[in-house]
C-alpha cells in the first residue's frame, strides 16, 4: 500500500484523526510522519519546501472548544476549490485539514445555538447552509484535490475508489391500521369522521374487511424490488412505547416480531435500532428498546438511527457507545437535502470535549423522503431531478449516497401517492452507476 510521508512537527489527536480520514478512509492509502521536512510529500507546517504544502491555521493544535470560532469562518474559492480557514504561503490557500476537522467533528453543534421544535440543531444554523455549500460534498472534493496535487508532484499511485449506494428504511409504523388495538382504531376512525376524511374512512374499513392490504405493510413489494436490483438495505426498527411521536405497535405483538425476524433473514438486509423519541433523554428506556430487539433476533444489534433524528453532542453518541452501537446513521437534516458534515462518506466520531477519536462510525445520509415532498414542496417528477443532481455530485467524488425512506413513504397512499416511483428511480439510477464503473 502506498504510504504518504507527512511532516507535522507536533501531531495531536486531531492531526491523527484528520490524516486518517483523508488518506486512509477517503484516498485508500497509508500515511506516516517524518521528522525531515525535505523528504515529506505533505508538509503541514510553517516551514517552506517543495512538497505539497498546507500552512496550518491552528485548529488542530488546540485542545479546547472555542466559542468565537464562527467569526473566523469565511468561504472563498481558489484553485477551483471552495473552502475556509484561509492561510498564506502554501500550495493551497486554505488549511483544508482544519476546515475538514471543523465540519466532521460537528464543532458548531457544541456551540450555543437555537434549538428547533424537536430540540435539534437546525440546518439554518450551519455554516454550510449560510454559505450555500450544504449540497456540496466538500471534504470529498478536497480529498480529490490533494490526490491530484500529490500525483502531479510525486511518482505515487492511489487506488481507484468507487461510488457506493445504500438504502436505509425506518419502520416507524409497520402497519397503518392493523394490530394497533381497538381503542387506537376507534379513536382513529372518530378523528377521520370529524375531519370528514372520506378516503381514510374507506381505506380503514377496506383493510379490516380484507378487501385491500394495509398500505404501510408493503414489505413483499420491497423484497421483490430490492432483490431485482441486489440493493443493500438497512431497516431501522422503532420499538418505543406509544406516545405523541412514537406510533408503532407493541414490540410484544407476534405479528411485529414475525416481521422483524423475516427482515433479519433477508440476504441483502441488515437491521438497526431506531431509538424512540423519548429514549434520547431516557437511557433506561433506550437500553430496554435495544435489548428487546436483540432478544427478538437472537443477536446483537450494532447500528442505529435516532427517531426524528434527535441527537445532542456529545451526549447521544456517548450513550450509543455505552449501549454497544458501532455505527450510527442519524447525521443529516429532515428539512434540507445535502451533507450535514460536508462529506459523502462514513467517518469516525471525534469527541470534542474529550479530544479523542472514538470507534463509533458515522454514516451520513444526504436525502430523506420527507424533504422533497414536504419541505421543498416538490412533485415526484421534480424530486427525481433533485435526486439526480445529488447522485451526480456523489458519483463525481466516489462517495457513498445514503437515502432515508420509510415504509409509509412507499405506501402509495395519501400524501405519498406517486412517491414509490421516486424510490424506484433513485435505486435504478444508483444501480446503473455501480454497474457502469
Q: Where in this protein do the model-derived segments appear?
A:
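Terminal accessory/targeting
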Residues: 1-254, 345, 352-437
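Catalytic domains of cell-wall/extracellular-matrix polysaccharide-remodeling enzymes
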Residues: 37, 277-356, 414-416
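Conserved hydrophobic/aromatic pocket- or pore-lining residues that grip, position, or stack substrates
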Residues: 170, 274, 320
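Metal-dependent polysaccharide deacetylase catalytic core of the NodB/CE4 family, i.e.
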Residues: 173-177, 198-200, 223-311
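Glycine-centered flexibility motif
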Residues: 271-272, 336-340, 399
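Short acidic/histidine-rich active-site segments
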Residues: 272-274, 330-332, 404-408
Amino acid at each position: 500500500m502506498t504510504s504518504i510521508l507527512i511532516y507535522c512537527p507536533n501531531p495531536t489527536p486531531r492531526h491523527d484523526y484528520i490524516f486518517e480520514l483523508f488518506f486512509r478512509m477517503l484516498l485508500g492509502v497509508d500515511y506516516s510522519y517524518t521528522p525531515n521536512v525535505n523528504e515529506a510529500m505533505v508538509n503541514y507546517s510553517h516551514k517552506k519546501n517543495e512538497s505539497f504544502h498546507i500552512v496550518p491555521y491552528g485548529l488542530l493544535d488546540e485542545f479546547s472548544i472555542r466559542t468565537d470560532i464562527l467569526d473566523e469562518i469565511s468561504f472563498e474559492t481558489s484553485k477551483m476549490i471552495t473552502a475556509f480557514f484561509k492561510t498564506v504561503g502554501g500550495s493551497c490557500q486554505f488549511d483544508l485539514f482544519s476546515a475538514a476537522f471543523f465540519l466532521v467533528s460537528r464543532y458548531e453543534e457544541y456551540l450555543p445555538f437555537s434549538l428547533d421544535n424537536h430540540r435539534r440543531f437546525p440546518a439554518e444554523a450551519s455554516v454550510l447552509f449560510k454559505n450555500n455549500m450544504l449540497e456540496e460534498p466538500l471534504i470529498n472534493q478536497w480529498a480529490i484535490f490533494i490526490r491530484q496535487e500529490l500525483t502531479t508532484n510525486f511518482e505515487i499511485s492511489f487506488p481507484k475508489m468507487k461510488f457506493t449506494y445504500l438504502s436505509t428504511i425506518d419502520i416507524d409504523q409497520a402497519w397503518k391500521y392493523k394490530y394497533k388495538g381497538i381503542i387506537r382504531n376507534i379513536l382513529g376512525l372518530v378523528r377521520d369522521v370529524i375531519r370528514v376524511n372520506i378516503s381514510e374512512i374507506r381505506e380503514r374499513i377496506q383493510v379490516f374487511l380484507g378487501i385491500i392490504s394495509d398500505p404501510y405493510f408493503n414489505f413483499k413489494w420491497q423484497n421483490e424490488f430490492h432483490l431485482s436490483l441486489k440493493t443493500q438495505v438497512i431497516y431501522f426498527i422503532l420499538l418505543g412505547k406509544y406516545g405523541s411521536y412514537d406510533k408503532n405497535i407493541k414490540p410484544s405483538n407476534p405479528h411485529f416480531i414475525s416481521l422483524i425476524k423475516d427482515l433479519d433473514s433477508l440476504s441483502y438486509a441488515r437491521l438497526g435500532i431506531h431509538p424512540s423519541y423519548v429514549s434520547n433523554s431516557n437511557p433506561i428506556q433506550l437500553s430496554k428498546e435495544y435489548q428487546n430487539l436483540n432478544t427478538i433476533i437472537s443477536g446483537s444489534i450494532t447500528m442505529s438511527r435516532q427517531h426524528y433524528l434527535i441527537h445532542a453532542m456529545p451526549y447521544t453518541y456517548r450513550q450509543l457507545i455505552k449501549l454497544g452501537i458501532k455505527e450510527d446513521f442519524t447525521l443529516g437534516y429532515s428539512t434540507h437535502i445535502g451533507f450535514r458534515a460536508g462529506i459523502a462518506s462514513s467517518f469516525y466520531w471525534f469527541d470534542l470535549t474529550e479530544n479523542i477519536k472514538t470507534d463509533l462510525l458515522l454514516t451520513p445520509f444526504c436525502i430523506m423522503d420527507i424533504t422533497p415532498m414536504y419541505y421543498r414542496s416538490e412533485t415526484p417528477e421534480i424530486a427525481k431531478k433533485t435526486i439526480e443532481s445529488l447522485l451526480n455530485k456523489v458519483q463525481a467524488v466516489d462517495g457513498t449516497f445514503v437515502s432515508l425512506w420509510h415504509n409509509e413513504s412507499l405506501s402509495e397512499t395519501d400524501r405519498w401517492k406517486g412517491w414509490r416511483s421516486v424510490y424506484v428511480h433513485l435505486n435504478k439510477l444508483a444501480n446503473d452507476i455501480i454497474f457502469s464503473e
